[in-house]
Amino acid sequence: MALHMRMIVFLCLSLPIWAATGDYRKQPDGIVLQTAEGTLRVQVVADNIIRVTFAKSAILFSRNASAVLPYTPAVKWSLTDAGGEIAMTTARLRVRVVRNTGCVSFLDSAGRPILAESPGGHVVESAEVQGEQTFHARQLWQANADESLYGLGQQQKGTLDIKGYDLDMWQHNTNVVVPLLVSSRGYGIFWDNMSYSRFGDLRPFQPIPAENLSGLTMAPMDGSTPPATVSAVEVGRAPGGGRGGARPKDSRWEGSILAPVTGDYQFKTYSNGAIKVWLDGRLVIDHYRQGWLTDEDQVKVQLAANQRYAIKVEWTAEGGNTLRLTWKTPSAETGKFSLWSEVADGVDYYFVYGPKLDNVVADYRLLTGQAPMMPLWAFGLWQSRQKYDTAQQSLDVVGEFRKRKIPFDNIVQDWQYWKPDAWGTHQFDASRFPDPDGWIKAIHNLHAHLMISVWGKFYPGSDNFDAMQNAGYLYQPNLQEKMKDWIGFPYTFYDAFSLGARQMFWSQIDKALFQRGIDAWWMDATEPDLTPSPPTLEGQRTHMPQTAMGTGSRVMNGYALYNSEAVYDGQRSAAPNHRVFILTRSGFAGTQRYASATWSGDITSTWTAMAKQIPAGLGFSISGMPYWTQDIGGYTMQQKFSTRTPKPEDEEEWRELNARWFEFGVFTPLLRVHGELRVREMWALGGDSHPAYQAELKFDRLRYRMLPYIYTLAGEATHHAGTIMRPLVMDFAADKSARELTDEYMFGPAFLVAPITAYKARSRSVYLPKSEGWYDFWTGKAVAPGTRVDAAAPYDAIPVYVKAGSIVPFGPELQYTGEKPADPLTLYVYAGANGAFTLYEDQGATYDYEKGAFSQIPIQWAEASGTLTVGKRQGGFPEMPKERTIHVVLCSKDKPTGFRFEAAPAKSAHYVGEAVVLQLR
């Protein structure tokens, strides 16, 4: 399954280099056009996918690194030359190209405009980056006033609709780049470039000028000194200053801002510690970052010209030493949006038309690869901690899950199972892991699986390091500078862009780990983490100077793609029928084809961080990536939680934070608990009788009962390029109120989920999009669509609603995923609209499904007749249940039925694979 990236070659050999402006040549898959600025190529990839490339040279446009898989266009299309304009037509699209400028616009088959490039929108400028003579490439498009824009990976700014925001796109801890931009108008743009990129206005953020900042004072929040006049909101060192330094005092700034023009202003903070920013009394930024991982937060605010706005900033250091507030005035490029890359041979993007957004995602995966099936056990509970120090410690945790009969599948061994000076050996420290084979076997005997942490990082002095170094597979700047990590040892990373290095890396972890029986891979720090935290763009550039695929700047966002390829290809070669599971901190377009899930990095244990994970996960999902997860409970704790003797009120907040986060996590693709310092197992949250423990246990049981539904969503992700965690725009694009929301989402086609992200909240406002209707999952009460309700949220429940017409399968009580088949199968049917659901099942651990070994059971609800049809089973596999009991629970307006673990069915049937019709009313 290895993907050896093809050389993409743009050889306009049919065009002489002296071709006149406006001359073009038709080719089998499109046209090549000479403009005054360069050479444009428009290719028909599919009847709804168009590739646009633009280069300065009329002779050569070549690349050897791309996330796009090889393809052979075979699409019927026609060309019409109207003199000043060339029209290309497929069954689903019309593409117009202005001959003298090369400006491209896209229309649907009826001639309705979808998207248009801005005149002069191909911008390719000569540049030198890392000693390479190259180009900066930028493309501008006309923004539609009524559209929202989503995607480009995972951001931590609390935004989902990124239209009007300016974003830096480079991989670093908690921020993941996937260059797919998706519009509410039903199209996507895949920007095929791996270098540092930017979305939006290219002007840098700047300190607020003195003429716009009046009466600014700064004072310690403890009142120890009077306010002092200052010229900027800032503390401490510049980005990349590293750890340590004197601790500044908690401080408050107050003053006013004068807006020079009317429009959208962006404010950005770069900070660690806790920061809050108010404008005219409205809290616009509420952000906390650990001291060693300084990062940005950003907000867009509309201000009116010549008006003053009160500004207040409060900063609590909590181990931090850096704060900087900057702004950007309204862009002169209003009405446009753009993508820019630092290193490019030219503009290169794919226009994908849905118009359903599920189709946009599906065609992104057509270009970059389909997601294989994850093992069934991956959809159970993952228990992790930083870190289990001994084999016995983790084994005791597994045993405690089984003793307590808490549903659970996966234990995670984080870093430093090796000796302190042996990073990269992948060898267990015998003093703490005396019998690795016996430990792994014991975990398996308890019906659990083991994921283990592996880094592409090496300390000098080991056989693995020497083998990599002697082959030329290690990045040298770290070694030359004798750079040390936070533990105090020199280190570097291997060059994942080298096929030979990837093969060597796999051979090392295969011998040390996979052959012992490791079940899954935790590929940490896959940006890669080349410099001490906080990471900087310049640090990434200078410490990845040259790779096997070109300069580090050219490919720097793609490291995780090739690192995942190393493990996926290696394992499929070593054990062809053993499903791969990779968890990676970074990601990129195409990592989904290597059985890779991404988690949101080293986030903090705060309510605001939890709230930001909702749009972070949704942005990542709509970027075409089906598997996302997070550190439930947050990774780094605030001091009030991490102290040895927390105050009772802080301890209660800690427990509730974990419980609410777990409740949210149950309705995400992967359920994973992880964090540092404190024990994260649910029984540590106040004991068996505490509501936090009871809430997590209830939701864990619910997760396992939902497995038939969740695994079907996974089957959809593989077989039909489905999306599990869904921004509301994917299902309700016409409902503007829905698509603006960042704190609600769909989990599959049935569930609308509204997590609780505030301490002591026992209700919250929930908007129910326009549809056939909704039901409260817990009570069964019908709720009108297109309305906002005050939804109850007791400690052990978050607002969850089910769309009318949904059919949701639930399985039996389980202790682990493979304990028994989904028998009996309980179908909850939510009346009010016709509905359908196709249950997907396969063996769960092998790749036999690739050969057709899976089954599907179509289920249909007919609203008018009140009948449920469980259709004839299609396909099969040896291990499938040949027969089972099916219970049906009907929820309707006149018979509200909430979810119950032991529900009384309205009807039951014995199912043997043939169609069964049940009359429910």
PLM feature spans:
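Catalytic-domain carbohydrate-binding cleft regions of carbohydrate-active enzymes
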Residues: 118-214, 237-249, 274, 303-308, ...
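Short, surface-exposed tryptophan/glycine-enriched loops
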Residues: 298-314
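Extracellular Ig-like/FN3 beta-sandwich strand-entry sites
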Residues: 262, 306-308, 883
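Sec-dependent signal peptide recognition
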Residues: 2-10
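N-terminal accessory segment at the very beginning of proteins
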Residues: 19-209, 243, 264, 281, ...
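Beta-strand-rich extracellular modules
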Residues: 270-272, 314-316, 873
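N-terminal signal peptide c-region/cleavage motif recognized by signal peptidases
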Residues: 14-16
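Aromatic-lined ligand-binding clefts that engage carbohydrates, nucleic acids, or primary amines
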Residues: 257-277, 311
